[in-house]
Each structure stands twice: as C-alpha cells, then as structure tokens.
C-alpha cells in the first residue's frame, strides 16, 4: 500500500492494482494484542485504511482476498485466485512490485497442528484467538517467544485474568536490549504475575487434558489451555522462489539499490527483501 501510494504521487495517470490475499490492507501489528485484551474494542480501529478509503484518496484499486499464485515474467503476467469465489485469472503488468512481507516462523516441531496452538501476525489471527477465548474461556496460556508481540500478548492475556507463562530459548527477553536493561523488564513482567521460563528451547506440542502441553528441551513441559507461537517471522518468498528470482539470506529477495530484483521490471520491498545493515 505504501509503495502504491508513492507511485500515485509520482504518476497521476498510471493504472495501479494491488492484490492482497488477506481481507485487510493496512493495520498496526502492535495493536493486535490490545484487541485480544479488550483495550481496543472496535475492530475497525485496528485498520488504518480500507480498500474503499484508499481508492477514494489515491484512485488505486485494492483487491483484497485475491492471492497471486504465480509470476510469469516471460509474458509479464501474474496468476491470481479470488479467494471468495475461487475464480482464477491472469493480470498483465508493465512493472511488478512484490511486497509479500513475512510470515510467522513455524519450526518443524511435533504437534504444530494442535488446535489450541496459535500464531499472531495478522488481523485474521487476532480474530481467531479472540473468538477462541470468548467461546472457551481458557484460564492459562503459554507464549513461546519474548519479543515485542509476545510481551504485548502476555500483558493482555494477563489483563483478562489468565495465568501466563513466557518461554524463551535465550536467557533474556527482548534480545535487542542489553542484559542489564532486560533485567528491569524481567522484574516488571514478574511483578505483574507473569511466569518466565528462560533459556529453555521448545521441542514440540501435545494436546492433553483439554489443553496443550509445551514440550521443552530439558524433558519437562508447560501445560496451558492455549499456546501461542511468537518466535519471530520469516520472509514469505515462495512466489519469488518459484519465479526464479535470486534469493539471499534466510530466503529473502535480493535487490539492488533501486529495489530491483534479478528479473527485469520486477521490484521488491518490505519485510521480504534482503537489506544492507549499515551499523
């Protein structure tokens, strides 16, 4: 959406079409846990723009619930599936921008198909967790991952009265912070009644006694009514790979200083691309 808006500002005449496989085009990820915790009660407050408002402002066609399934750079088209109707069609392009973003990291662990195991990345994920809580009233949760989303979710589940445990493979939360600063975070989190299990790696999940047990590398397990996997994200680049684009670190899309990929007239931006770190 950001790239599309910028193109419109540079070119008032260009025909711009955006395909988005989810039902939402612009939302604040860090606000999602606060909808689960009832701090945000109106779901419309999660979104910054709608397809209608975006078209009204920028004259850009935003086709939500449309998934691009293939790129044909030899004839400069993409294959698209309408997720509501099942219709499939091809759309031509002069220039193509890939911005698939990132998906929750899903390690190859046993029990990943457990019904009470969730991830939190999209608005749809948020509604799924919220609906489960409203319908089943879980009393406890285990969150795997101690980054921003994991901590915000822990805060909100605790506010709902749930017993919350965070398990982290490293020996501190918030790895970008120095250990002495992380110590203050640990103290604050524990002060609010959240349990920390640090330096323990998750090895799998098993549904048991109406809940889910999170299996740890030391042979122990953490029981919860639900579990949430929040261990980071991975570039979502399967389309680029299938189209033959050059990939780099962790499967990210390689681009030059102009954000051009290895294929002419295809650009890429966002969480899916490889960038230079100048520090």
What are these language model-derived features?
Residues 13-15, 57, 63-84, 91, ...:
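A Rossmann-like FAD-binding core segment of flavoenzymes
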């Amino acid at each position: 959406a950001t790239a599309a808006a910028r193109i419109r500002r540079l070119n008032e005449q260009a025909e711009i079409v955006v395909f988005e496989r989810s039902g939402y085009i612009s939302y604040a990820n860090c606000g999602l846990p606060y909808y689960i915790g009832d701090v945000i009660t109106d779901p419309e407050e999660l979104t910054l723009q709608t397809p209608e408002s975006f078209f009204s402002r920028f004259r850009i066609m935003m086709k939500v619930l449309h998934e691009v399934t293939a790129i044909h750079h030899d004839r400069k088209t993409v294959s698209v599936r309408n997720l509501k109707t099942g219709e499939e069609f091809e759309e031509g392009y002069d220039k193509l921008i890939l911005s698939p973003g990132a998906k929750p990291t899903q390690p190859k662990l046993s029990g990943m198909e457990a019904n009470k195991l969730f991830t939190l990345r999209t608005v749809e994920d948020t509604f799924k967790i919220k609906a489960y809580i409203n319908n089943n009233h879980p009393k406890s949760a285990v969150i795997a991952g101690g980054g921003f989303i994991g901590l915000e979710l822990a805060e909100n589940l605790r506010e709902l009265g749930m017993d919350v445990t965070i398990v982290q493979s490293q020996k501190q939360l918030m790895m970008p912070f120095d250990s002495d600063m992380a110590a203050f975070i640990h103290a604050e989190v524990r002060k609010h009644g959240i349990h920390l299990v640090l330096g323990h790696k998750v090895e799998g999940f098993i549904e048991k006694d109406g809940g889910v047990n999170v299996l740890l590398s030391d042979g122990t397990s953490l029981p919860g009514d639900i579990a949430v996997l929040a261990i980071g994200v991975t570039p979502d680049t399967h389309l680029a790979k299938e189209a033959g684009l050059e990939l780099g670190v962790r499967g990210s899309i390689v681009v030059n200083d102009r954000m051009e990929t290895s294929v002419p007239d295809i650009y890429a931006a966002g969480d899916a691309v490889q960038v230079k770190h100048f520090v």
